[in-house]
């Protein structure tokens, strides 16, 4: 039986396992894991999330941060596809003071885990979404006066102050922030600061490139802009968190750590510039059936592969609907019995064929690694990206919504 789970259904399912998913106690988390393990026995594909590696990545990242710098763990896209509910006990255990999300559903899962700390949204939201998050104490990201005015009206209606992080465009993303190089931009920023019921608790920007020199240059601009705004708006510096650093910037431009950093990919082992943080996820399936084909047999749609000898093909119950791209056909390898096997023919919606002619011991039920490690062999992110012709996050965020997860230690 296929298990297709949206973020919301994952959250609901996590809540129905046991109260363990709402607890910070590790033994109770293991109880939930056992339930998930039983589910994958009836699934065609699954993800294995290594909680030990997740913890190690957090601890290693912490060791490079200034003592006074807060860490805000970015868990948008359901923790980059790894599952917020399953990772929150580790976040709480590691005493991470802030979590960043994108949607209200994600915010609810974080709060349901027992997390009482700072919770911020790292994208713009429309006013209905903001209103829906009031009871969750979500700090919003804003970058326009119109947003601030709408929030001020909501604050008055709800009789509740809304905390916000004001985005400046000094980093050059051009998607959320105010341009402080113009007089109009400065006037708008000051007007935002004066809105009743809107409390600025942070000033931030975001850098679009992995380029340390560029970051340093733009960091100087951000510092000037934020200092000007704090002074002219009569904000208390001690009440404002200045934050600009994602995973790359926090590790490679230490002077940009400021008051808070926002690591995302590095925690899950996806930071191409820093490979010392291993991936916490593996993507797996099993052999459904074996097929003996004579020489000159074609395989898959478009007959793009033809056998050159008598061959043994293993049918894998995974395809592009599970997040294994069509382009993997005739290009990618998978791991089976500790060896590499070629994907042959075009990957279908629900089926992938691999050539196991020269691999001994393959049988229905044999485990197949699509991404991750098996014995001494590895399928890594760079290999996946090359074969699929997409950036890795495009894949693992789909994996997380299309496949059940099991959490291992």
Swiss-Prot record:
Keyword Zinc: no
Subcellular location: Periplasm
Cofactor(s) listed: pyridoxal 5'-phosphate
Positions contributing to substrate binding: 175, 349
Record has Disulfide bond as a keyword: yes
GO CC list: cytosol; periplasmic space
SMART domains: Ala_racemase_C
Pfam families per UniProt: Ala_racemase_C, Ala_racemase_N
Keyword terms, alphabetized: Disulfide bond, Isomerase, Periplasm, Pyridoxal phosphate, Signal
Gene Ontology molecular function terms on file: alanine racemase activity; arginine racemase activity; lysine racemase activity; pyridoxal phosphate binding
Position of the signal peptide: 1-25
EC number(s) recorded for this UniProt protein: 5.1.1.10
Catalytic activities: an L-alpha-amino acid = a D-alpha-amino acid; L-lysine = D-lysine; L-arginine = D-arginine
NCBIfam families found in the cross-reference section: alr, PRK13340.1-4
HAMAP family: Bsr_racemase
Name the UniProt record assigns to this protein: Broad specificity amino-acid racemase
Annotated source species: Vibrio parahaemolyticus serotype O3:K6 (strain RIMD 2210633)
